[in-house]
From Swiss-Prot:
This is B3 domain-containing protein Os02g0764100. One of its GO terms (cellular component) is nucleus. It is found in: Nucleus. The keyword NAD does not apply. It comes from Oryza sativa subsp. japonica.
């Protein structure tokens, strides 16, 4: 593990699939969730008692470095994951949510080799190169399901006033309806 060799040229690689990493893929769970359809097609596991803890898979990156990950199926959620070795890969590659992992296999030769590469997401949010907020640009950030969601900014007081006006209009409308019904009700009682 970690050995560097002459990298396999891209023409000798056959693309298998890509996965945009999520916050949980690069977070404290220390695992990469492999989409089930790709896992079963490209990294099949034989269901035996001897490999209950998974198997070790070797992947070569674009620099010729070999990475070893434990690959297993979590029976509780029927999820396929790369675990042991994944957090080190994330750290060394500087992966962040939104980056893409590219999996490929050898296109030639009798041995089926596996390759892993990273494509960085170049948006400001993914690289941490956000510009400083100047006055008047303050935005509200809410964390929901592990994602930071920024508000559209704007003047919140306008929205609050619209809600207040909406309540007043509702009460006035309700009063008018009551007044309209009362005379008719009174006429019926006479």
């Amino acid at each position: 593990m970690g050995a560097r060799a002459q990298p396999t040229p891209s023409w000798a690689r056959e693309p298998l699939f890509e996965k945009a990493v999520t916050p949980s893929d690069v977070g404290k769970l220390n695992r990469l969730l492999v989409p089930k359809q790709h896992a079963e097609k490209h990294f099949p596991l034989r269901r035996t008692s001897s490999d209950a803890s998974g198997v070790l898979l070797n992947f070569e990156d674009g620099e010729g470095k070999v990475w070893r990950f434990r690959y297993s199926c979590w029976n509780s959620s029927q999820s396929y994951v790369l675990t042991k070795g994944w957090s080190r890969f994330v750290r060394e590659k500087g992966l962040r949510a939104g980056d893409t992992i590219v999996f490929s296999g050898s296109a030639y030769g009798p041995d089926k080799l596996l390759f892993i590469d990273c494509k960085k997401n170049n948006t400001a949010a993914a690289t941490g190169d956000e510009k400083p907020i100047t006055s008047g640009e303050a935005t509200r950030v809410v964390r929901l399901f592990g994602m930071d969601i920024t508000g559209g900014g704007g003047d919140c007081r306008k929205r609050e006033r619209a809600v207040e006006m909406g309540q007043e209009a509702f009460l006035m409308k309700r009063q008018c309806v009551v007044h309209q019904r009362t005379p008719a009700l009174g006429a019926l009682l006479l």
